[in-house]
Structure formats: C-alpha cells, structure tokens
Amino acid sequence: AGLTKRSLFDPSCTGVFDRQLLRRLRRVCDDCFNVFREPNVSTECRSNCYNNEVFRQCMEYLLPPHLHEEHRLAVQMVGK
C-alpha cells in the first residue's frame, strides 16, 4: 500500500514520504502553472522530485525569500 500511496503523489520522490511536504512542493508547481499557463511548467516543475531549475524559478518567483531555504530542504528530504 505504501508504494501506491507514494505514487499518487510523486513517483520520482524516493526519500522521506511526507505528505505535507509533498503537498507544499506540489502547490508551488500548481501555483506556477496557474500564473504562467504553460502546459509543460507543471510537469517539468515536478520532474526529478522537484529538484530542477523550473521548480527553483517558480519558488523564487512565488515565495518570499525567507521561505526558499525551507523549500530547498524539503526537496532534499523527499528526494533521493
């Protein structure tokens, strides 16, 4: 069941399975998609478990600087 639950979130994330962290990271991608309306933003933002340039750009664009480090750490935790 763990694997199914995990894959409902983001199959590329093989680190800590933390629903809240994953939800927060996904929200950055969703908000980014809503702002830019580029079809590939959502997919690219989630690729490699959020450890990518698109996610970083979305985060810098959408989030106040004091939250950047927190999100970077979250990416490391849920990633490999």
Swiss-Prot record:
InterPro entries referenced in this protein's UniProt entry, alphabetically: Crust_neurhormone_CS, Crust_neurohorm, Crust_neurohorm_sf, Hyperglycemic, Hyperglycemic1
One of the GO BP terms on file: circadian rhythm
Tissue: Produced by the medulla terminalis X-organ in the eyestalks and transported to the sinus gland where they are stored and released.
SUPFAM superfamilies found in the cross-reference section: Crustacean CHH/MIH/GIH neurohormone
Taxonomic superkingdom: Eukaryota
Valine amide PTM sites in chain numbering: 78
Compartment(s): Secreted
GO molecular-function terms, A-Z: neuropeptide hormone activity
Disulfide bonds: 13-49, 29-45, 32-58
Keywords assigned by UniProt, alphabetized: Amidation, Carbohydrate metabolism, Cleavage on pair of basic residues, Disulfide bond, Glucose metabolism, Hormone, Neuropeptide, Secreted
UniProt family annotation: Belongs to the arthropod CHH/MIH/GIH/VIH hormone family.
Protein name (Swiss-Prot/TrEMBL): Crustacean hyperglycemic hormones
Organism encoding this protein: Penaeus vannamei (Whiteleg shrimp)
